[in-house]
Swiss-Prot record:
The lineage of its organism: Bacteria, Bacillati, Bacillota, Clostridia, Eubacteriales. The keyword tRNA processing does not apply. [4Fe-4S] cluster 2 binds at residues 430, 467, 478, 481. This is Tetrachloroethene reductive dehalogenase. Residues 411-440, 478-496 form the 4Fe-4S ferredoxin-type domain.
Length: 551
């Protein structure tokens, strides 16, 4: 509990109890908020640490980016055997019905396959084909999955798909995108694309020009440089920003780029894709084209060795997320992915004009969550996501590597791990039952992991094969674990309630109930979210409310 005296403990206990007692009356929020903040600061003060806050075993090895759920999709070997969950039936662990175990068979049926489960590749390509709008979802007539909702989703993801090389899936180095040339004399657009660098562009040719002209900007100190970079990053579009030291542990052991081949589309244009879309749509099965693999050689591909990483967070829309698992919730995720590329590119240009090398990245190149933890932006939660103090897990992370030496931030602890031990709402809300129900995180061993997990770090198990299987069935990404999270809410005072509750025994059992008493989140049970009409009502509210609810 830390160094607190008896009087302060009693004060905090009474304040925490008072918060619980009045939790059904929203009129008192303004009164309770400062009291709860005081209690939280006494009982669960925010702390900083110089070391990485989670255990990393000596056996830890860097993660191969081609192992993650989405990149693994394009390995032809993954199309030879049925998708494999870590636990075939989790009901023996949770004591509840396993709502995810039948997904591989359901997805196979959607593809016209009889008598066997879908492969990993078939599962993921089913998702991608629906996500790109090339195939209707099975819910396309339902509120939240209509043509209107899908059109918004397409617009939100457009920059990520068209100008970022779909680095949301991972990969590196940088991004390559197909664009259609235009004849400036006739204004005719070609039907055959050419491959060019995307917004995650590692071309640092301008840096040497700045240096040769003696124009490299000199900062008075690492601290000043960090202050300036943070200010610039916020102006250029980030909602939160921190500085992490370059840590080789988080750089992927293998970089890779999906091999794209020309596919003739119904409109007559050629589109480069990493799978044969026309063949799939004509009933010919799923065929993928593999990867081009790269050694993680910074000097070869970016021209420098990183010293610092600028890590930033983009908030996702609260109203859109609470419609999960509808397509509207996917739209705010897509907007963030599109903005990640734009903001990272602008930060990289800023650094290059100052005479410093930069490599803008999304999910590619290295693991974002531990870098964000090192940058002081949040803690790692039960659902495997970064939990920030302001937005909870309702955000996306991007980063820019640079050779500019910056003063790093320190990891911060504000009660997330303690709360996640008690809450388990994200695990209960997962339609695929992909998130561990175990109380405590642990250093995962190989036998604890499914194929896309990296062992020997301290965390809760998350089965991406189950998660991705529901995405395929749903026809859209799912954000249930974000929507129900108590740290997701737009009013930060209930985050303080959560911090207090984890430290006071009498309140621990009610830790996950506080935001529910105020009507946040909606049903936790994934079936009830849909069957009760909650998701449909949230979609209607989203379209009927012209103003976004902001933090």
């Amino acid at each position: 509990m830390g160094e607190i005296n008896r009087r302060n403990f009693l004060k905090a206990s009474m304040l925490g109890a008072a918060a619980a007692a009045v939790a059904s009356a929203s009129v008192v929020k303004g009164v309770v908020s400062p009291l709860v903040a005081d209690a939280a600061d006494i009982v669960a003060p925010i702390t900083e640490t110089s070391e990485f806050p989670y255990k990393v075993d000596a056996k830890y090895q860097r993660y191969n980016s081609l192992k993650n759920f989405f990149e693994k999709t394009f390995d032809p070997e993954e199309n030879k055997t049925p998708i494999k969950f870590h636990y075939d039936d989790v009901s023996k662990i949770t004591g509840k019905k396993d709502t995810g175990k039948d997904l591989p068979m359901l997805n196979a049926e959607r593809l016209g396959i009889k008598g066997r489960p879908a492969t990993h590749t078939e599962t993921s390509i089913l998702f991608h084909t629906q996500h790109l709008g090339a195939m209707l979802t099975q819910r396309h007539n339902e509120t939240g999955w209509t043509g209107l909702d899908e059109a918004l989703n397409a617009g939100a993801w457009a920059v990520e798909f068209d100008y970022s090389g779909f680095n949301a899936a991972g990969g590196g180095p940088g991004s390559a995108i197909p664009l259609y040339p235009i004849n400036p004399m006739t204004n005719e657009i070609a039907n055959e694309p050419v491959m060019v660098p995307g917004l995650y562009n590692w071309d640092n040719i301008d840096v040497e020009s700045v240096r040769q002209q003696g124009q490299q900007w000199k900062f008075e100190s690492k601290e000043e440089a960090s202050k300036i970079l943070k200010k610039a990053t916020r102006l250029l579009g980030a909602d939160l920003v921190g500085i992490a030291p370059y840590d080789e542990r988080w750089t992927y052991s293998t970089w890779g780029r999906k091999i794209q081949k020309p596919c003739k589309m119904p409109n007559g244009r050629t589109k480069y894709l990493p799978w044969d879309l026309p063949k799939m749509l004509s009933g010919g099965g799923v065929e993928v084209f593999g990867h081009a693999k790269f050694e993680p050689d910074w000097e070869k591909y970016a021209g420098f060795k990183p010293k610092s990483v600028i890590v930033f967070v983009l908030e996702e829309d609260y109203e859109a997320i609470r419609t999960s698992p509808s397509v509207i919730s996917s739209a705010t995720v897509g907007k963030s992915y599109s903005n990640m590329a734009e903001v990272a590119y602008k930060i990289a240009v800023f650094l290059r004009k100052l005479g410093y090398y930069a490599a803008p990245c999304g999910n590619d190149t290295g693991i974002s969550v531990p870098m964000a933890v090192q940058a002081g932006l949040g803690e790692a939660g039960r659902n495997g996501l970064l939990i920030t103090q302001k937005f909870g897990p309702r955000h996306r992370i991007a980063k820019v590597y640079t050779d500019l030496e910056l003063a790093p931030d320190k990891p911060r602890k504000f009660g997330v791990r303690e709360f996640c031990r008690l809450c388990k709402k994200c695990a209960d809300a997962c339609p695929a039952q992909a998130i561990s129900h175990e109380k405590d995180p642990k250093v995962l061993q190989p036998e604890d992991c499914e194929a896309s997990e990296n062992p020997y770090t301290e965390k809760w198990h998350v089965d991406s094969e189950r998660c991705g299987s529901f995405w395929a069935y749903n026809g859209s990404p799912c954000s249930n674990c974000v929507a129900v999270c108590s740290w997701n809410k737009v009013e930060t005072w209930n985050h303080d309630v959560a911090r207090v509750a984890t430290q006071i025994p009498l309140l621990q059992d009610a830790a996950r109930k506080f935001d529910e008493w105020f009507g946040y989140s909606g049903p936790v049970n994934p079936d009830e979210r849909l069957e009760s009409g909650y998701v449909q009502n949230m979609v209607k509210d989203f379209w009927n409310n012209p103003e976004s609810i902001k933090q």
